[in-house]
Amino acid sequence: MARSKSSNRWLEEHVNDPFVKQAQQDGYRSRASYKLLEINNKDRLIKPTDLVVDLGSAPGGWSQVAAKLVGHKGRVVASDILPMDPIAGVEFIQGDFTEQEVFDQIMAILDGARADVVISDMAPNISGVNAADQAASMYLVELALDMACQVLKPKGSFVAKVFHGEGYDEYVKTVRESFDKVVIRKPDSSRARSREVYLVAKGFRVA
């Protein structure tokens, strides 16, 4: 079966992508690791001893970065519907965190502790229908925000991938209602033609 032009373009980009090559050299599971590293270098979100919750963590690129940043005295709790190979210093729960059973497992691992940072690089499976894909991506990021508001400690931080499109402006407005400072980042490691940006929210205000 012949590849489509778009899949050929993706393959060519992937093969020639310097961040893909760098990830292989550095032992990261995906190029996405550099997005979190860039964001953290600018915004100083994750610090040694922090407790980080990683939503939609597979294959583990962000969890790897978070584990290095928090060090052996910190904790990373990760969750994804998909399986994820073990990472030293990361406690992983497979399942949908919106389901009560999985949510309860996460809360049990946290054991009353509140997260310093919640991170989410979640994205839906792309159908190619822009309206449907945008709706699906906004749904995921709304779920991530809801989860963050349930587990963050006061003054905690939240980072999530968001796609420009319908619902974007309203979402940013909603996040501002719960955090002292909200900025939008477009890391160098994010492909220029991608509509993705990263919302960085600091200073969580507990309702």
From Swiss-Prot:
Write the record's keywords in alphabetical order, separated by commas.
Cytoplasm, Methyltransferase, rRNA processing, S-adenosyl-L-methionine, Transferase
- State the source organism's domain of life: Bacteria
What role does it play?
Specifically methylates the uridine in position 2552 of 23S rRNA at the 2'-O position of the ribose in the fully assembled 50S ribosomal subunit.
MF terms in GO: rRNA (uridine-2'-O-)-methyltransferase activity
Q: Which chemical reaction does it catalyze?
A: uridine(2552) in 23S rRNA + S-adenosyl-L-methionine = 2'-O-methyluridine(2552) in 23S rRNA + S-adenosyl-L-homocysteine + H(+)
In which compartments does the protein localize?
Cytoplasm
Cite the PANTHER family for this sequence.
RIBOSOMAL RNA METHYLTRANSFERASE (PTHR10920), RRNA METHYLTRANSFERASE 2, MITOCHONDRIAL (PTHR10920:SF18)
**Family matches, as HAMAP family:** RNA_methyltr_E
User: EC number(s) for this protein?
Assistant: 2.1.1.166
Instruction: Report if keyword S-adenosyl-L-methionine is assigned.
Output: yes
GO CC, one annotated term = cytoplasm
Q: By which gene is this protein encoded?
A: rlmE
This chain belongs to the protein called Ribosomal RNA large subunit methyltransferase E
Tell me where it mainly resides: cytoplasm
SUPFAM superfamilies, sorted: S-adenosyl-L-methionine-dependent methyltransferases
Which amino acids does the record list as binding S-adenosyl-L-methionine? G60, W62, D80, D96, D121
A Pfam family matched in the record: FtsJ
Entries under Gene3D superfamilies matching the protein:
Vaccinia Virus protein VP39
> What sort of enzyme, by top EC class, is this?
transferase
Active-site residues from the entry? K161 (proton acceptor)
What protein family is recorded?
A: Belongs to the class I-like SAM-binding methyltransferase superfamily. RNA methyltransferase RlmE family.
